[in-house]
C-alpha cells in the first residue's frame, strides 16, 4: 500500500503591508498545492483548549494543516500571547482567533487590524456590540489583500431561553440568533457563530455565501453533559447548512485525532457531493 502521508514545505514571504504570507505545498505531489479549494475545503476547526504552549505544540505537531483549521481562545492566548499564534500561522495553519471582541468601535477596529497584521484567518466579535462596532471592524480590514474573516457571535451555545430571560431578553434563542445574524450581515461581517439548530433558518434568511461557524459538534451526542447545550454531530450540522465545525475535546482527547479529522472530512465530502 502506498504511503499516503504528506510532507509540507512552508513558503514565507511578506505582502505589501509587511505581513507574513504562508502557503503549503505538497512536495510528494506537485499537483496537490492547496487542499482548501472551494471543492476540497475542510470544514473542521480544532479548538486548541490547552492551558500552555508546550501541550499545544505537542498536540499540533501531529496535525496536518490540510485536514483542519485551528482555534485559539481566551485562556491559551492570555497564557501565551501572540507568539504562539504567530508560530502556528507560520506552520501553515489557518488560525481562528476566538477572543470575542466587545468594546467601543475604535478599540475593536484596532484589534481587528492587529489580527490582520498577524495573518489571522478568522476573528470574532459579539454582534450585540452593535452596528457601529461591526462596521468599524469591517472598515478597518477592508484594505487588506487577504483580510481575516469577521465573524459575529450571536447567542453562546451554553445559553438556553431561561438564560436569555435572566438578562432581560424574553425571546427564544433561535429568534435572537436570527436578529443578531441579520444585523451582522448588514454591518459588513462575513458570517456568524451559531448552533447547528440555527443553521437551516439562517441559510434561508441570509443566503448561501454567509459563513456559519458551528460549535457544539460531537461525534456522539448520547450521554453528553458538558457545557454546550445545543449540539449536533458533524453530519447533522453539515446537512443543516453549517460552513465550519468547531471541535475541541472530540479531537484533542481522541486516541487518534488524525483519524477523527479524516472521518469528519470524509463525511463532509459526502455531504458536498
Stretch-by-stretch model annotation:
Residues 28-51, 55-58, 200, 204-205:
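N-terminal amphipathic alpha-helix/helix-capping segment at the start of soluble metabolic enzymes
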Residues 44-48, 70-72, 95-99, 123-125, ...:
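Hydrophobic faces of well-ordered beta-strands that scaffold small-molecule active sites
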Residues 41, 103, 107-111, 118-190, ...:
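Conserved anion-binding
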Residues 134-138, 251-273:
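C-terminal helical cap(s) of enzyme catalytic domains, especially alpha/beta-barrels
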Residues 106-114, 225-242:
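Catalytic cores of alpha/beta
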Residues 84-96, 139-151, 202-219, 264-272:
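Alpha-helix-loop-beta-strand connector modules within alpha/beta enzyme cores
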Residues 125-130, 230, 234-260:
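Glycine-rich phosphate-binding active-site loops on the catalytic face of alpha/beta enzymes
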Amino acid at each position: 500500500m502506498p504511503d499516503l502521508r504528506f510532507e509540507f514545505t512552508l513558503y514565507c514571504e511578506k505582502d505589501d503591508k509587511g505581513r507574513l504570507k504562508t502557503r503549503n505545498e505538497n512536495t510528494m505531489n506537485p499537483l496537490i498545492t492547496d487542499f482548501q479549494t472551494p471543492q476540497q475545503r475542510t470544514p473542521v476547526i480544532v479548538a486548541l483548549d490547552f492551558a500552555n504552549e508546550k501541550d499545544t505544540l505537542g498536540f499540533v505537531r501531529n496535525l496536518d494543516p490540510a485536514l483542519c483549521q485551528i482555534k485559539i481562545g481566551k485562556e491559551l492566548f492570555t497564557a501565551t500571547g501572540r507568539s504562539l499564534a504567530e508560530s502556528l500561522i507560520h506552520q501553515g495553519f489557518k488560525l481562528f482567533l476566538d477572543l470575542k471582541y466587545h468594546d467601543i468601535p475604535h478599540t475593536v477596529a484596532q484589534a481587528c487590524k492587529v489580527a490582520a497584521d498577524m495573518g489571522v484567518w478568522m476573528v470574532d466579535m459579539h454582534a450585540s456590540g452593535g452596528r457601529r462596532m461591526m462596521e468599524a471592524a469591517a472598515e478597518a480590514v477592508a484594505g487588506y489583500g487577504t483580510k481575516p474573516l469577521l465573524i459575529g457571535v450571536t447567542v453562546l451555545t451554553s445559553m438556553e431561553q431561561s438564560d436569555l430571560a435572566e438578562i432581560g431578553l424574553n425571546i427564544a434563542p433561535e429568534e435572537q440568533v436570527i436578529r443578531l445574524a441579520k444585523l451582522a450581515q448588514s454591518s459588513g461581517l462575513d458570517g456568524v457563530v451559531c448552533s447547528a439548530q440555527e443553521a437551516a433558518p439562517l441559510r434561508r434568511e441570509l443566503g448561501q455565501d454567509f459563513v456559519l461557524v458551528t460549535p457544539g459538534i460531537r461525534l456522539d451526542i448520547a450521554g453528553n453533559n458538558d457545557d454546550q447545550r445545543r449540539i449536533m454531530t458533524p453530519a447533522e450540522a453539515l446537512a443543516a447548512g453549517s460552513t465550519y465545525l468547531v471541535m475541541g475535546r472530540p479531537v484533542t482527547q481522541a486516541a487518534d485525532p488524525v483519524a477523527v479529522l479524516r472521518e469528519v472530512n470524509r463525511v463532509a465530502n459526502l455531504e458536498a457531493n
